[in-house]
């Protein structure tokens, strides 16, 4: 699905994402959840985030998809198209193949991580992490706190007060 294709109807995708009987598997889903929240005022549920599951299983705090695929499946993923111009249409065959390879292994990774979580008795740990990521309150913007999302390099109180006021505006 080319989500930014002119005139595309994303309703079938949103219907799938909101189907509570289908587990949606992502890797590092937080930005996706934020986008879905701002588009639909909701987040997909249930979800399984392979990056969060990998953290719970001991693969590190923020393992990349290609490293996770390499560690669990022993497969190298070509990431050479990662920084190409994805706004340019039509997408090249190289970009399409990259996009396909970026999701091809999700099901196998999901199955292996699910098994590891069960064997290690850590399924509830994952549920707690995913509850936060899929909670709509996680993505609600509080104007009084939005300034905390900015990377401010100054610790001067007057400057911070000004940044806070501008951000809330």
What annotation goes with each model-predicted range?
Residues 93-167:
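Mixed-charge, glycine-rich, non-catalytic linkers/tails in nucleic-acid processing enzymes
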Residues 1-116:
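Conserved DEDDh/DEDDy metal-dependent 3′-5′ exonuclease domain
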């Amino acid at each position: 699905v080319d989500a930014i294709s002119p005139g595309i109807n994303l309703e079938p995708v949103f219907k799938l994402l909101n189907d509570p009987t289908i587990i949606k598997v992502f890797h590092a889903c937080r930005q996706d959840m934020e986008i879905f929240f701002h588009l639909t005022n909701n987040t997909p549920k249930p979800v399984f985030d392979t990056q969060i599951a990998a953290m719970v299983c001991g693969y590190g705090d923020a393992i990349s998809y290609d490293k996770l695929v390499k560690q669990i499946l022993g497969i190298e993923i070509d990431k050479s198209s990662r920084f190409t111009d994805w706004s340019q249409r039509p997408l090249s065959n190289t970009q399409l193949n990259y996009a396909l390879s970026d999701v091809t292994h999700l099901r196998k990774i999901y199955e292996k991580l699910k098994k590891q979580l069960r064997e290690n008795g850590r399924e509830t740990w994952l549920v707690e992490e995913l509850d936060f990521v899929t909670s709509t309150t996680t993505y609600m913007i509080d104007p009084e706190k939005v300034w905390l999302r900015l990377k401010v390099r100054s610790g001067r109180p007057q400057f911070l007060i000004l940044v806070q006021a501008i951000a809330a505006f």
